[in-house]
Amino acid sequence: MAHIHIKLTVSEWDIGGKSNTTSYVLDSEVTQVGEELVVNKAFPKRYTFIVKELSDTEICLSCECPPQYVHLKKGEPYHAEYNIEGYEDHDGCVWNGEDEYLTIEWL
């Protein structure tokens, strides 16, 4: 159906101001709508995408990260910012959440 060549960059910032940035280029042949694109085992599960729509100039992906649908156009990077909520573990220790910044570029 189409050849997809996209770059994902994720930056995570914790409450202490420490950051971690990871990038990965996905180069894949998509044969049908509904196909799963696994970015990389190193990326969290929420960055596994399902192809919902595909044309020569636009792709619609669904994923577990907010927002649920990503509309990506060639030459127009997509940016999202969200917070992964903190939690309290079984010992009562509160772990703070992280801010994440996601950029997707269709190369």
Predicted regions and their residues:
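Short intrinsically disordered terminal tails
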Residues: 1-3, 31-32, 105-107
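Short, extreme N-terminal segment that most often corresponds to the first beta-strand
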Residues: 1-18
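Intrinsic-disorder/low-complexity, polar/charged segments enriched in Ser/Thr/Lys/Arg/Asp/Glu/Gln
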Residues: 3, 19-23, 46, 77
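Generic short N-terminal amphipathic or hydrophobic helices
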Residues: 3-5, 83, 103
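Compositionally biased regions
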Residues: 12, 20-24, 29, 49, ...
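Edge beta-strand at a domain terminus
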Residues: 21-28, 90-107
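Acidic, low-complexity, intrinsically disordered interaction modules
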Residues: 33-98
